[in-house]
């Protein structure tokens, strides 16, 4: 049977009992090694991925998995991690193995070694990996007869022994899982002798030659199993793809992402910094960054007012009891900063006259918003009640995961909590999702999909019935939006299911943006009520919603999305006057005054630098509009536009230039201005 290769392929194929999956794939005429869509594993009827060497006991229908799919790439990367580990133990025989899973766009492996790996070490390891790949070693699955056999074989690998004993634990550990303990041996293709092996549940590609293209990218320190109380290991990262072309494309993307890194641009553009004296994950915004942040907030504030939100403010710290009531201290304590014990009073001899109490920095604003709702009686006529706050919160993130503005310890959420009746819930969710998508679009993000996070069976509060009702409401609204919906089983917070709006940036990377979370639980815990139309007391439904997620994170994402070249309406400096010579400065200052009268953020560069150097500097600073003026411009009452793409419009009457800039900013154009896009009449 031959299966045509189409966008929807591969169709299921049959593997006869006693036959390898590889033979069935070959008989079906599906692509083999060397093709980007080569079949690397198959998926059986239970959803389990199987090696191509798998032989079913009875006839089985399987779905071939191609190398150029997410699942196929994951298998290739997992196999590449094994090749890396083999190379490390050959070149560094004292190395002890940690874990080596595939990750998004790549893989890593952790090693216990005496010294950190150097760039030269990575070059040597990559060279040895290429030799192993060229050898075509076979990946061979082997089942341990018992834990005792596994322990005996792995006696020299302490981290693997820990995984053997924790076999039923973490499902994300690639080494163990399922009903069996298994190893994968790398076999010499000629002699079939074992060359190297690793504790692993698989699956793997047939041979090392099925790794078409790979590269080691970097190394770093990492704690064993991500716990800072455990041993510090050395982690080597790499990436592997279905073709050299795909690898090259990915490496170019990495290079571009590094160029756009918001931490790098934040320093180069004088936007923000992270002083050591303040602490990890705590940013300070410089004047220019403060302008961008203010514009982000002010536009959002205006839109929220138009949409019927009421603004509130709450303190940064609160008594511990509030977080006992909310459940945060039961379910979220690890993400909170330690308590401050305050208000105790003592006699002169040290005897406690008045006991103190614990206060916490708030990790979330929602408990305080419930208190605002509860501060007086509420009627159904007041609902939906939409409370909104730019509220600064503090979360204890481990230092190893803090990452610039996108993963911080202190940040400001654009936090809203909506209280409505159950009858209003569906309509409120639908209008809320529309509002979120429209507002994100105003900032230039337009490529979205949705993620539905559902209950973690081991970490939730409230009844199953409440969770089911909330999940159904969110799923219905998501379906009505027409956007792709990706399930996230068990990914919800402890108090309710949520929809996350995922946005793709200019590089195609996905970022979690807005979250919309239904909560029947908080109204119960805080005993929130309203008087219904029939006079009875009813519980409202609560919706948690953060549109940006946090101002800081959104700032970082937009910085990378625009590569620092913010739209003119957000740019810290919207226009700059660049004189040909000093005598042209007064004229440009008069043009700047005209622009300032319209609210434009404009500067005139009166420095001693030559004009060409000024243009280079302000181009690097991503100023949207550069206005040049020399003798002819002054005589004609004109300016010349210069843009970041090096295009230019000469001899534009100053009033026309001012009008064009003011209109561009007022229209909130998100594209980069250029001679092609800016509509002005030239005086020449």
UniProtKB/Swiss-Prot annotation:
GO CC list: cytoplasm
Record's cofactor remark: Binds 1 zinc ion per subunit.
Any GO BP: threonyl-tRNA aminoacylation
Reaction catalysed by this enzyme: tRNA(Thr) + L-threonine + ATP = L-threonyl-tRNA(Thr) + AMP + diphosphate + H(+)
Residue segments, region Catalytic: 261-567
Transmembrane segments: none
TGS domain residues: 1-66
Top-level taxon: Bacteria
The protein's Enzyme Commission number: 6.1.1.3
Localization (cell): Cytoplasm
Cysteines paired by S-S bonds: none
GO molecular function: ATP binding; metal ion binding; threonine-tRNA ligase activity; tRNA binding
Enzyme class: ligase
Functional description taken from the UniProt entry: Catalyzes the attachment of threonine to tRNA(Thr) in a two-step reaction: L-threonine is first activated by ATP to form Thr-AMP and then transferred to the acceptor end of tRNA(Thr). Also edits incorrectly charged L-seryl-tRNA(Thr).
Subunit structure comment from the entry: Homodimer.
Family: Belongs to the class-II aminoacyl-tRNA synthetase family.
Protein name: Threonine--tRNA ligase
Biological source species: Mycobacterium avium (strain 104)
Organism ancestry: Bacteria, Bacillati, Actinomycetota, Actinomycetes, Mycobacteriales
Gene name for this UniProt entry: thrS
């Amino acid at each position: 049977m031959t299966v045509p290769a189409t966008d929807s392929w591969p169709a299921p194929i049959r593997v006869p009992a006693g036959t390898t999956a590889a033979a069935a794939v070959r008989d079906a005429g599906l692509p083999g090694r060397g093709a980007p869509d080569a079949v690397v594993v198959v998926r059986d009827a239970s959803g389990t991925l199987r090696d191509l060497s798998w032989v079913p006991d009875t006839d089985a229908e399987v779905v071939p998995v191609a190398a150029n799919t997410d699942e196929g790439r994951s298998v290739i990367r997992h196999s590449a991690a094994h090749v890396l580990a083999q190379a490390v133990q050959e070149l560094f025989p004292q190395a002890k193995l940690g874990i080596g899973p595939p990750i998004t766009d790549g893989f890593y492996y952790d090693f216990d070694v005496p010294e950190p790996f150097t760039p030269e070490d990575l070059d040597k390891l990559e060279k040895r990996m290429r030799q192993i790949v060229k050898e075509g070693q076979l990946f061979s699955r082997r089942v341990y007869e018992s834990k005792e056999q596994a322990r005996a074989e792995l006696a020299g690998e302490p981290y693997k022994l820990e995984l053997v004993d924790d076999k039923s634990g973490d499902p994300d550990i690639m080494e163990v899982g399922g009903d069996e303990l298994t190893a994968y041996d790398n076999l010499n293709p000629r002699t079939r002798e074992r060359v190297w092996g690793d504790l692993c549940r698989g699956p793997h590609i047939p041979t090392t030659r099925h790794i078409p293209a790979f590269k080691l990218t970097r190394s770093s320190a990492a704690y064993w199993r991500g716990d800072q109380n455990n041993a510090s290991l050395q982690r080597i990262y790499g990436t592997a793809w279905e073709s050299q072309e795909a690898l090259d494309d990915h490496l170019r993307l990495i290079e571009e992402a590094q160029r756009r890194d918001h931490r790098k641009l934040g320093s180069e553009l004088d936007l923000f910094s992270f002083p050591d004296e303040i602490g990890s994950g705590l940013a300070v915004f410089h004047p220019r960054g403060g302008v961008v942040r203010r514009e982000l907030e002010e536009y959002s504030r205006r839109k929220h007012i138009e949409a019927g939100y009421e603004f509130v403010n709450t303190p940064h710290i609160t008594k511990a009891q509030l977080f006992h009531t909310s459940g945060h201290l039961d379910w979220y304590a690890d993400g909170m900063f330690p308590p401050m014990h305050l208000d105790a009073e003592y006699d002169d001899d040290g005897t406690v006259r008045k006991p103190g109490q614990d206060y916490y920095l708030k990790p979330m604003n929602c408990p305080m918003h419930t208190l605002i709702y509860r501060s007086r009686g509420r009627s159904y006529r007041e609902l939906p009640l939409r409370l909104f706050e730019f509220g600064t919160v503090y979360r204890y993130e481990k230092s190893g995961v803090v990452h610039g503005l996108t993963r911080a310890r202190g940040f400001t959420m654009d936090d809203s909590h909506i209280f409505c009746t159950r009858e209003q819930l569906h309509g409120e969710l639908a209008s809320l999702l529309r509002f979120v998508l429209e507002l994100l679009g105003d900032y230039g993000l337009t490529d979205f999909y949705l993620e539905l996070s559902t209950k973690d069976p081991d970490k939730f509060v409230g009844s199953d019935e409440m969770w089911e009702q909330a999940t159904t409401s969110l799923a219905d609204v998501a379906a009505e939006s027409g956007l792709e919906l990706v399930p996230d089983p068990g990914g919800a917070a402890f108090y309710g299911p949520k929809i996350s709006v995922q946005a793709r940036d200019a590089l195609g990377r996905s970022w979690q943006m807005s979250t919309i979370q239904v909560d029947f639980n908080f109204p119960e815990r805080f005993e929130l009520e309203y008087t219904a139309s029939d006079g009875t007391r009813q519980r409202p439904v609560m919706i948690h919603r953060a549109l940006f997620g946090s101002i800081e994170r959104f700032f970082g994402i937009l910085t990378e999305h625009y590569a620092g070249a913010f739209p003119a309406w957000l740019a810290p400096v919207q226009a700059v006057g660049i004189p040909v010579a000093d005598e042209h400065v007064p004229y440009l200052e008069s043009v700047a005054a005209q622009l300032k009268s319209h609210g434009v953020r404009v500067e005139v560069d009166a420095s001693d630098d030559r004009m060409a150097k000024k243009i280079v500097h302000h181009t690097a600073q991503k100023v949207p509009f550069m206005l040049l003026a020399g003798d002819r411009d002054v005589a004609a009452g004109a300016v010349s536009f210069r843009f970041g793409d090096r295009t230019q419009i000469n001899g534009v009457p100053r009033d026309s230039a001012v009008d064009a800039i003011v209109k561009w900013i007022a229209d909130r154009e998100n594209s980069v201005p250029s001679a092609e896009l800016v509509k002005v009449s030239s005086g020449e």
